[in-house]
Amino acid sequence: MASTGSQASDIDKIFGFFNDGEPPTKKPRKLLPSLKTKKPRELVLVIGTGISAAVAPQVPALKSWKGLIQALLDAAIDFDLLEDEESKKFQKCLHEDKNLVHVAHDLIQKLSPRTSNVRSTFFKDCLYEVFDDLESKMEDSGKQLLQSVLHLMENGALVLTTNFDNLLELYAADQGKQLESLDLTDEKKVLEWAQEKRKLSVLHIHGVYTNPSGIVLHPAGYQNVLRNTEVMREIQKLYENKSFLFLGCGWTVDDTTFQALFLEAVKHKSDLEHFMLVRRGDVDEFKKLRENMLDKGIKVISYGNDYADLPEYFKRLTCEISTRGRSGMAREGQLNGSSAAHGEIRGCST
């Protein structure tokens, strides 16, 4: 019993400031054995809009593509960058749920002068307006999610995101840790990320708002990467050899950018094992998603019935995975006569 108390104490040290000491009110969802036995360095975390929406729920632009385009449109109108007829046209397209990628592309083109000087684009101003002061809009439960992601990163997991925001990087900076934001415009860095030489970097496959020139909405926007056989080979090896863990993603695997990067070369492989954490929600929808994803080698796992269940579930999962990862590194360190593993163990409980 003493060892159990010690383990709980270590977990509290990592995640303690979110623990109010109250006993759980309902039985937590069990962790899937095939996932909880993974080591951090065997994982690639895929961060979707659901995570950003949970971290800063008061920012509509983080909740969906439609919310982002509406926020950009509102900013453009506030800055008097569109004529009345133009703004009405964009509002109509959004209301009618026209192809959102095309709507976003047209809006960006409208806000960007025909020049190679990215600094002169109004699109950049609108982006900064939409994502202004994100640090002050993070909620504690969302910070717990980011803390878990950061902890897995520090223990060897890779991270990529479909989001334009830099919430994870901002949270890490607040903790005194530096993360680098990457996008697909820098082939050299993307290659190094895929080769696990830039583990404390976050790959934004659609770009990040702090670098407007790197934002891409369609595969045509990153042909430089698609044509680079060395980069593509390393990227696709990740999907073949590691387990991707989708967080707040839903239908991310239908995203054309994600498909072009990771799925095209592995369509017919049957030995893939990836995971997707989702809310149980509607039973029929959950069943449909699970069946659809199994065909793609992705196990859909319910973390609970409510969105509020995710932070606690992911915290438990992170602790389980990190503990196994550290014990494995300790064994490797002993075999190699290395002291580095000891540092990893101490680092987990700080």
Curated annotation (Swiss-Prot):
It is found in: Nucleus, Cajal body. Keywords: Acetylation, Nucleus, Phosphoprotein. Pfam families: SIR2_2 (PF13289). The keyword ATP-binding does not apply. Residues 330-350 are annotated as: Disordered. Its main location: nucleus. This is Protein FAM118B. It comes from Rattus norvegicus.
